[in-house]
């Protein structure tokens, strides 16, 4: 009986952790993948620096995603989307490479195209999925670079 009780004692916490995994996956966070020029990037969305407010048909969403490893060094990406759903008219994308301090890359609705595949609210979390393509400007020589990013985000909805 001691073997069975030992298995129960260790098995119950393990089972509880496994059952909690789907709930954790549904919490805030997500992933951004794509390219900046010819450089592939994969960034993790920081839940504590990302949120959305919805008032009627108007939405104001923003998230910060970061890539800490890789040849480019730390990279931050901030995407802000504002406007009436289902097609918000304003957006801004900012990309900052830690090695190029003060030389951010920025694009907005004039140089970028946003395709939203999903914008659904439920239980205090908003699922935001889509693709942004176009051009960003900045960097050391005020250059222009093509970007394509797909994002699959779960953002906390603020009141």
Predicted regions and their residues:
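An ectodomain-focused feature that recognizes extracytoplasmic/extracellular
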Residues: 25-109
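Acidic, glycine-rich flexible loop segments
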Residues: 90-156
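Bacterial N-terminal signal peptides that target proteins for export
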Residues: 2-12
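N-terminal signal peptide c-region/cleavage motif recognized by signal peptidases
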Residues: 20-22
């Amino acid at each position: 009986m001691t073997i069975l009780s030992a298995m129960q004692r260790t098995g119950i916490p393990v089972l509880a952790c496994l059952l909690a995994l789907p709930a954790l996956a549904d919490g805030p966070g997500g992933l951004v993948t794509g390219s900046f020029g010819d450089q592939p990037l994969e960034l993790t969305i920081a839940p504590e620096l990302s949120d959305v407010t919805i008032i009627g048909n108007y939405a104001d969403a923003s998230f910060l995603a970061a890539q800490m490893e890789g040849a480019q060094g730390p990279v931050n990406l901030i995407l802000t989307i504002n406007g009436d759903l289902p097609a918000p008219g304003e957006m801004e994308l900012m990309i900052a490479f830690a090695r190029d301090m003060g030389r951010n890359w920025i694009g907005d609705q004039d140089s970028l195209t946003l395709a939203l595949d999903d914008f659904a609210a439920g239980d205090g979390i908003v699922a935001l999925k889509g693709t942004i393509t176009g051009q960003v400007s900045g960097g050391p020589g005020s250059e222009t670079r093509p970007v394509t990013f797909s994002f699959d985000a779960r953002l906390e909805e603020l009141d």
